[in-house]
Amino acid sequence: MSSSELIAELERERDRRVLSIQSHVVHGYAGNKCSVFPLQLHGFEVDFINSVQFSNHAGNIEYLTLPTRYEHVKGQKLTEKELEELYEGLTLNNINNYTHVLTGYCGNVTFLQKIADVVKDLKKKNGNTTFVCDPVMGDNGRYYTPKELMPVYRDLIIPLADVLTPNAFELGELTGSPIETEEDCLRAVNELHAKGVKTVVVTSGVTGAQTNESLRCYASVKGSHVYRFTFPRLVGQFVGTGDTFTSLLVVWLDELNGDVSEAVKRVLASMQCLIRKTSSYAQLQVDTNSRAMCELRLIQSRKDLLWPPTCDQIQVEKIGQ
């Protein structure tokens, strides 16, 4: 990318505004702290509501000999009444005008139910509003949110969603069957299409389709094509990668007019660079007992987030109509 191309991209005006309802951390990266910056970098205006505000994230990592979690987490959780009041203020001032709604971590049932009300109202006001939902519930066979969220996602949220980005565990919970193979995955994706979701991206976790060297994700557009993406498995698991992935997906689906194959490929290219940079930085640190050194190197990866590099290691295959 030349300097002139970079400047032109940074100066480009985009008539896009996202309402992002996710978690927030003061230190480090998770939820809105991961999602807002990539969107703004690409010229999207972002209004964000923090479902929770914590001192730091509470997630697990797997890297080097580091402690898997921060020892302490402090903060507050937004209630459904407080969400209602915030949205009421936007509505009364007639500033609830959004091209996209993005949702991620939600800590309780009534808050998620209120999100459904907000999305319904926004879609009633503007039928072209795109709702992108990451149905955050758990991973690797276990929940890290209340299980009671699942039926709310299944019955209230999914029928409203235009784009859904579950991992394999979440996909299985939403459709009632475990996802172990590619065939399981594609069957479950079709069930989500039948419920009205136009685009489904299964971000990770289809164990039968993975190897020690590579991972896979899948993307499907209702009534169109299904794609398989194979890419290198990098060392380490870092908190916030899913939130970053989904925000970049918002960008590239919009930029490429819904071309999910190219959009996901660009997202994966940026994510590979981000994870490599995070991993390299962590290995160079002297204090190997510091949990904080494995926070995503999001700011330092801004060029790769803005302009995904060509990555020959990402293989894209069309596997269905």
Swiss-Prot record:
Required cofactor(s): Zn(2+); Mg(2+)
Residues the entry annotates as binding substrate: 23, 144, 243
Catalytic activity: pyridoxal + ATP = pyridoxal 5'-phosphate + ADP + H(+)
GO molecular function: ATP binding; metal ion binding; pyridoxal kinase activity
A Pfam short name: PfkB
Entry note: cofactor: Divalent metal cations. Zn(2+) is more efficient than Mg(2+).
GO cellular component, one term: cytosol
Residues that bind ATP: 203-204, 230-242
InterPro entries found in the cross-reference section: PfkB_dom, PyrdxlKinase, Ribokinase-like
Source species, domain of life: Eukaryota
Keywords linked to the UniProt accession: ATP-binding, Kinase, Metal-binding, Nucleotide-binding, Transferase, Zinc
EC number: 2.7.1.35
GO biological process: pyridoxal 5'-phosphate salvage
Gene3D superfamilies membership: 3.40.1190.20
Classification via PANTHER family: PYRIDOXAL KINASE (PTHR10534:SF2)
Chain's role: Required for synthesis of pyridoxal-5-phosphate from vitamin B6.
Family indicated by similarity: Belongs to the pyridoxine kinase family.
The name this protein goes by in its record: Putative pyridoxal kinase
Organism the protein comes from: Caenorhabditis elegans
